[in-house]
Structures are given as structure tokens and as C-alpha cells.
Regions:
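Surface-exposed, glycine-biased beta-strand/turn segments
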Residues: 1-57
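Zn2+-dependent peptidoglycan hydrolase active-site motif and core
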Residues: 43-80, 106-107
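Short, well-structured beta-strand-loop connectors
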Residues: 39-48, 81-96
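Conserved, short, structured surface segments that act as functional micro-motifs
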Residues: 85-128
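Residue-level recognition of beta-strand microenvironments
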Residues: 20, 51-52, 79, 96-99, ...
Length: 128
């Protein structure tokens, strides 16, 4: 198993990061502004383990990758994969949106978790 630091991760979308990772304020990911309907892609090969609507974060997808890594994609306008689906790095999994009560505009909220610990995605991925 290759360490995360040595693994190429696809950016889920390209765009401007408008809200950065901050554990102190419980923002466990980054917000990336993009256009409604832009394609959201998987950062690595993996299996979809959650693909549902939630009141707070709208249409959400979670993908389990090797090395105990989970990627999370929130506020989508549409989910394109079902739970149990195997995806490859770069596969389109959802479309950017503004769904859920916690959304403040069209963007993707993106998180990375390793063994239950949130990681700062900007340490591993260039979004611009």
C-alpha cells in the first residue's frame, strides 16, 4: 500500500477554494466554487459506500479507497453512482450543486478522512 503522500489524487473539481480546512471550527474539508452541473470525479479508485440525500448537506457521496482513506463529496445537484459501485480515479460520480440546508451557494464541499482522522485536502490536491 502506497502512502497517501506518494499517491497522485485527481482533483474532484477544479475551482477556487473559498473556505479552507479548519479543525478548530469543525470545517473538516474545503469548499470549492464551481458552476452548477460541473462534473465531480473520484480522487482515486474505490467503492461507493454512501450515496444519499441528507437535510444538512444535500446529495452526498462517500468513497472508500485503499489505505483506509475515505473521500466525501457534499452539496451535489445529482448523484451518478450507487452504493456498492466500483469507481476508478477520474470517474464522474456526481454533478456540482447547491443542495442541503448548510450550503451557501453553488460549490463542492470535499473531505478526506484517514483512519477516522480528517486530513486537509490542500496538502494532497491542487484545486486550481
Amino acid at each position: 500500500n502506497t502512502p497517501i503522500e506518494l499517491t497522485f489524487l485527481f482533483p474532484p473539481i477544479k475551482g477556487l477554494v473559498t473556505s479552507r480546512f479548519g479543525e478548530s471550527r469543525e470545517h473538516f474539508g474545503v469548499d470549492i466554487v464551481s458552476s452548477e452541473g460541473d462534473r465531480v470525479v473520484s480522487i482515486l479508485d474505490g467503492t461507493v459506500i454512501f450515496a444519499e440525500w441528507t437535510i444538512e448537506t444535500g446529495y452526498v457521496v462517500h468513497i472508500q479507497h485503499d489505505n483506509h482513506l475515505i473521500s466525501v463529496y457534499k452539496h451535489n445537484s445529482k448523484i451518478l453512482k450507487r452504493v456498492g459501485t466500483r469507481v476508478l480515479a477520474g470517474d464522474v460520480i456526481a454533478l456540482v450543486g447547491n443542495s442541503g440546508e448548510h450550503s451557501t451557494g453553488t460549490h463542492l464541499h470535499f473531505e478526506m478522512w484517514h483512519k477516522g482522522v480528517p486530513l486537509n485536502p490542500e496538502n494532497y490536491i491542487s484545486f486550481e
